[in-house]
Design a protein with these regions (language model features):
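Dynamic "connector" segments at or just before major functional cores
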Residues: 1-129
């Protein structure tokens, strides 16, 4: 007899967010500017991407993100094993890393990716913010 396991996971707008983040190479940029070190349980790119998902989908305070993420990562009604890695301490440390990285270059590359991916007109650009 074959034992089949299944679990229901929440999707919501995650595929759409992932699509646009992939188009802009957000994860690759985060990996480039905030590299993972061996002692980190969660890569900064993963933690910061989780924050982007949360902010767009259902903004929560940092201490509630892992609870929100459980339905997406571990399955609806399941024990939050994967999601508990995205606790407020992990997210806060990675926000500090983002603050400490070369954000100017990261934003310039992100803007260039958006211009390229969406064929935006660049006759006039105001780079004042």
């Amino acid at each position: 007899m074959v034992n089949i396991e299944s679990k229901a996971q929440m999707l919501d707008v995650q595929p759409l967010i992932t699509h646009y983040m992939d188009q802009l190479s957000v994860r690759q940029l985060l990996e480039k500017y905030i590299p993972k070190t061996p002692q980190m349980q969660v890569a900064p790119a993963d933690a910061l991407s989780m924050l982007v998902f949360n902010i767009i989908n259902a903004p929560n305070p940092l201490y509630k993100v892992s609870e929100w993420a459980a339905d997406y990562l571990d399955g609806i009604g399941e024990k939050p094993r994967e999601a508990e890695k995205y606790n407020d301490d992990c997210l806060g440390r990675n926000l500090d890393r983002l603050y400490g990285c070369n954000r100017d270059e990261l934003m310039i590359e992100l803007a260039a990716n958006a211009i390229h991916a969406h064929h935006l007109e660049t006759d006039k650009i105001h780079n004042d913010s």
